[in-house]
Amino acid sequence: KECCTHPACHVSHPELCG
């Protein structure tokens, strides 16, 4: 999941990396 590779996005949307 692309968001998971972007720290800021991962922090803002941890559910996308879950």
From Swiss-Prot:
Alpha-conotoxins act on postsynaptic membranes, they bind to the nicotinic acetylcholine receptors (nAChR) and thus inhibit them. Has possibly a distinct nAChR binding mode from other alpha-conotoxins, due to a different three residue motif (lacks the Ser-Xaa-Pro motif). It comes from the Eukaryota. One of its GO terms (molecular function) is acetylcholine receptor inhibitor activity. Keywords: Acetylcholine receptor inhibiting toxin, Amidation, Disulfide bond, Ion channel impairing toxin, Neurotoxin, Postsynaptic neurotoxin, Secreted, Toxin. The cysteine framework is I (CC-C-C). Alpha4/7 pattern. It holds the Pfam family Toxin_8. One of its GO terms (cellular component) is extracellular region. InterPro entries: Conotoxin_a-typ. The modification Cysteine amide is found at residue 17. Residues 5-7 are annotated as: Lacks the Ser-Xaa-Pro motif that is crucial for potent interaction with nAChR. This is Alpha-conotoxin-like Bn1.2. Disulfide bonds join 3-9, 4-17. It is found in: Secreted. Expressed by the venom duct. Belongs to the conotoxin A superfamily. Residues 1 form a propeptide.
